[in-house]
């Protein structure tokens, strides 16, 4: 099984970390993935480089398997991050567009209602990235943060994005690219050390965070993710939980029915997280302050109906 790292030459925040990683020892040229995607190999890691949008080049894992006969175990995408604040940041996040209805067009890849399998490395690598960024002097200039689940491309294997933000000045920062390269080098065990964040289901029932609610940067979920030995699945921000206020809805299937695609989002996020962490204890954590009373009640009742356990911060130990 191989790890697929995907970079695009169209984005300096993508190709620079890939180039820094490829400058480290042990890489050899690999096959060309049709039509023109270069690849490089080191142990069980493959880096591929294309020149198109990072969020719209679908099914690269399946295309690699078909072209090479190798089985892809996981996919890691390198990308730029944008933010209204323009604040420099290094981010990690799962992907999917769970809240969209059939027929809606995702603006940044993926497909409506879809959640990628979240990489098991998200939590451990987030903590490792924070330590590395601090050790290399990027903090406090750069914020080290998780992001909520969003955008494509479509994948079929466990996936995560590593991003550098938030403006062109920072996308091109070589020190940020170097830290991202070191994260991959050490996290994948390419330097000979033990890899970080590989899930082993036989090691007992460990706790996996399923974040529900809050803003895009999920600060209350992030406080839990910073705890040692906590694993991270999907993180659903408020915009991924569209809920129709029953007092504003004229026609509803029942008096207490809350419309919107929020149920679809929660169910898809839970199922994908459960699939990535076989044997794990999936615990939903609600950002209570981000919900109105009727929203919290509806979500809590739905989680109980679906037999999804809910945890408070102190339950994640």
UniProtKB/Swiss-Prot annotation:
Record note on cofactor: Binds 2 Zn(2+) ions per subunit.
Stored PANTHER family: D-AMINOACYL-TRNA DEACYLASE
Protein family (similarity comment): Belongs to the DtdA deacylase family.
Subcellular location: Nucleus; Cytoplasm
EC numbers for this chain: 3.1.1.96
Cofactor list: Zn(2+)
Annotated protein name in UniProt: D-aminoacyl-tRNA deacylase
Provenance organism: Arabidopsis thaliana
Keyword annotations of the record: Cytoplasm, Hydrolase, Metal-binding, Nucleus, Zinc
Lineage of source species: Eukaryota, Viridiplantae, Streptophyta, Embryophyta, Tracheophyta
Pfam annotation, one family: tRNA_deacylase
């Amino acid at each position: 099984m191989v790890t697929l790292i995907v970079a695009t030459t169209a984005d300096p925040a993508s190709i620079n970390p890939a180039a820094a990683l490829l400058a480290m020892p042990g890489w050899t040229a690999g096959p060309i993935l049709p039509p023109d995607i270069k690849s490089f190999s080191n142990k069980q890691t493959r880096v591929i480089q294309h020149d198109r949008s990072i969020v719209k080049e679908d099914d690269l894992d399946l295309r690699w398997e078909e072209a090479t006969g190798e089985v892809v175990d996981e996919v890691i995408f390198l990308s730029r991050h944008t933010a209204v604040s323009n604040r420099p940041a290094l981010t990690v996040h799962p992907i999917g567009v769970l809240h969209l209805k059939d027929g809606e067009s995702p603006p940044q890849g993926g497909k409506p209602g879809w959640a990628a399998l979240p990489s098991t490395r998200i939590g451990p690598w987030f903590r490792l990235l924070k330590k590395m960024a601090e050790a290399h002097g990027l903090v406090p200039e750069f914020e080290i943060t998780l992001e909520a689940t969003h955008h494509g491309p479509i994948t079929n294997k466990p996936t995560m994005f590593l991003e550098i933000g938030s403006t062109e000045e920072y996308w091109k920062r070589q020190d940020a690219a170097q830290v991202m390269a070191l994260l991959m080098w050490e996290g994948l065990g390419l330097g000979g050390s033990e890899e970080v964040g590989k899930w082993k289901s036989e090691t007992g029932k460990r706790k996996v965070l399923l974040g529900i609610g809050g803003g895009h940067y999920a600060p209350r979920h992030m406080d839990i993710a910073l705890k040692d030995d906590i694993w991270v699945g999907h993180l659903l921000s408020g915009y991924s939980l569209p809920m129709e206020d029953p007092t504003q809805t004229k026609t509803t299937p029942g008096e207490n029915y809350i419309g919107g695609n929020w149920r679809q989002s929660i169910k898809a996020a839970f199922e994908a997280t459960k699939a990535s962490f076989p044997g794990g204890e999936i615990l939903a954590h609600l950002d209570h302050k981000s919900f109105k009373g009727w929203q919290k009640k509806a979500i809590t009742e739905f989680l109980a109906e679906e037999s999804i356990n809910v945890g408070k911060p102190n339950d994640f130990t």
